[in-house]
Amino acid sequence: MLDVAEVYENYTLVSTNHLQEFISFNEPYIESVTGHYACAVSALLACGAYYNAVDYTDIAGDYMDIWDSTGTTVSSESGGITYGSTTIGNIGPGFVDFCAGKNVSVTQNTDYSPNYNFFTNCIDRGDIAVVHCGIISSDTGERAGHSMAVEGYATLRAYNSGNTVHTLMVFDGWGDTVRYLNFDFDSWTDISGSAFNG
């Protein structure tokens, strides 16, 4: 994952597009207002904000509504915070249900082996998506998954090698600034996507 400074220092932009406003809810804030955290729920909260389905006076209520609508289950508890895990197949449909409860009409398409255009087409039509990535944890030797809101894309060319890199501009669920996810990274165990249309 690349941050903005790294991108502009080491790459030139070949093509890019992104939503007009970058939406994020950092993990410490979410934990402080909800006592809970799940990456998919945080990603969907950003998606909900994009479609004007989030009540900023009740972030905690909306977060827990998304938690419930996606069937997110408790994976662990630590330091008074409840952490959750969400099945990929529940993420898109659960978000559609959450939005319907807010009288916002959104459809979804989940792809378990998306190509790069799955995400670029979504952004180009003015919508938002969620990417789900799997990788083998160096700590446990087991698959670890993470879901992030996709708010743009950038095809980059490295200054030193001339290699082209396809990236997704994501809210990583942890911080407040855009990160560039390398879609071409060869150590992903799996990549899935949920694209919305609203």
Regions found by a protein language model. Give the residues of each.
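Active-site signature of cysteine proteases
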Residues: 115-117, 133-198
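Active-site-adjacent structural segments surrounding the nucleophilic cysteine of cysteine proteases
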Residues: 1-85, 167
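Secondary-structure boundary/capping signal
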Residues: 55-56, 103-107, 158, 178
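Predominantly the structural core of cysteine protease catalytic domains
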Residues: 37, 45-46, 74-156
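Intrinsically disordered, low-complexity N-terminal regions enriched in serine/proline/glycine
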Residues: 7-10, 28, 62, 82, ...
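Feature targets compositionally biased, intrinsically disordered low-complexity regions
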Residues: 34, 60, 70, 78-79, ...
